[in-house]
Each structure stands twice: as structure tokens, then as C-alpha cells.
């Protein structure tokens, strides 16, 4: 049975009517029309669907709407703006990371939460924080450089 959910996404309030077990990802993409996060695997194994829920990265493909509650959801679109991009977004461009771009959502959202809480991370800590994310284009070295650059920018 469908239920009404009040969602705060990227600072704006929305109402969605859906099954409580429906993944947050579907509400974001289908009901709210956001083009990120992406559907990758549907099993929380690739990270393309990562969003922040109350500041913590979650895989929205397996997060039911009923688990969101009054939480605040931030997607990649809410992390920065074209006028004032998040340091990770700037670093990704400067390091020329994007190829196909499909996985960027997961990498940036995961790294943003990590860097917020870890001001001067080691390379090993960065690698550990990004464990479980997938990039089919194989840009892992460039991604690591971008996260290190962003850490310096945010330092």
C-alpha cells in the first residue's frame, strides 16, 4: 500500500507517494526527476547510487523510503553548484578523471563524506574509504589523485 513521504532533497522539500519498501533511488530519479544518482547494480555493490542521508553516504538502491524518515538527502547535484563547486568536483576536473562518468556520483559522494571527517588523510586511509566502489573505465589512479588534491584544497 502506498504512503506519502516528505523528503528533503538538496535543501528542498518534496512529497512522494510510494510503497514504503521502494528504494530511495527510484524516488529520486523517477518521482523527482533527478539524473543522479545512477542505477548501477541494484545490490549496493558498485556505489553509483550513493547519496548522503543526514551527512552519511548510503546506497540509495537498497535504502527503502521508510528508512529515510525526516532525514536530509543530498545528491551530487546538491553537493556544489556550477558557480561554487565542491572541492572534489573541482579536483575531478583538474585531474581529468571523468571518462564515461557513470560512476562519478558514488566516488564523489563517498569521498566528500570521508574528507569532511578526515582533514589530512593518508593515501591508505583514502583507499580504504573508497573500498567497494567500482569504475569500469579503470580511472582509479586518477580518482585517487583527485581525492588527494581535494583533501589538500579542503585542508
Predicted regions and their residues:
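Signature of N-terminal electron-transfer/Fe-S-associated modules in redox systems
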Residues: 1-155
Amino acid at each position: 500500500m502506498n504512503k506519502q513521504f516528505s523528503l528533503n532533497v538538496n535543501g528542498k522539500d518534496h512529497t512522494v507517494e510510494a510503497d514504503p519498501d521502494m528504494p530511495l533511488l527510484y524516488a529520486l530519479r523517477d518521482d523527482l526527476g533527478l539524473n543522479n544518482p545512477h542505477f548501477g547494480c541494484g545490490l549496493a555493490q558498485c556505489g553509483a547510487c550513493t547519496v548522503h542521508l543526514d551527512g552519511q553516504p548510503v546506497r540509495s538502491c537498497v535504502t527503502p523510503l521508510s528508512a529515510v524518515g525526516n532525514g536530509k538527502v543530498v545528491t551530487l547535484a546538491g553537493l556544489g553548484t556550477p558557480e561554487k563547486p565542491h572541492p572534489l568536483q573541482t579536483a575531478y576536473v583538474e585531474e581529468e578523471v571523468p571518462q564515461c562518468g557513470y560512476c562519478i556520483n558514488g566516488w564523489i559522494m563517498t569521498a566528500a563524506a570521508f574528507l569532511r571527517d578526515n582533514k589530512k588523510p593518508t593515501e591508505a586511509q583514502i583507499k580504504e574509504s573508497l573500498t567497494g566502489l567500482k569504475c569500469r573505465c579503470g580511472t582509479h589512479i586518477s580518482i585517487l589523485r583527485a581525492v588527494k588534491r581535494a583533501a589538500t584544497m579542503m585542508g
